[in-house]
Amino acid sequence: YLYFLMREIKKHNFSKVFDLQNSSRTNFYKNILFPKAGKEIWSSSATTLPAGKNKSEFDKNSVLERFEYQLKDSGLSTLNTLRPDFNWAATDISEIKNFYKITKYILLFPFCSPHLTIKKWPYYNKLIDLISSKYGEEYKVITAPGPTEISEAKNINALALLDNGRALDISQLTALIKDSSFVVANDTGPAHIAAHVGAKGLTLFGKHTTA
């Protein structure tokens, strides 16, 4: 996997990389791709550290504050960095809502990438039972599986929303999250969307969290 990834990246001859993950993994990539590169080629929290600060000190700032500093240091506009708003991506999903007859709903994202199963919380069906026993028909419990998650969604006791048998696209998904009453998600993309459209919710970080 790593060999093919590195070969693919090298093929494009990128002149600059903005590393916003700032993890040990992406630092490993840097050491393979651009071992001697400074911030002119590889922009990361490590290469753009403010004078007199070490990385552990710098990492005490919020993620968005670190992003702002890193991007500003590379000469990019950061007007919206501290106030990310993804609402612009939402599209009209009234037809889908009408088809499934949903108005008030709690949205679950029990899925994760196949290679990151450690992020998966295994108690969603128990949670659905608790929600149903407390709220009855007041809220529908739904999920929105991605293209590779449609089959897996059958194991979750929630209504799986699709668009004519296909997974919702990013704009439809954003609208669904935005209009939800509450979101419960693993640490995946939809959780980040929820945070940036102002949705109420909870992110679960693996199976160590009990129901």
What are these regions (language model features)?
Residues Y1-A211:
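Catalytic machinery of carbohydrate-active enzymes
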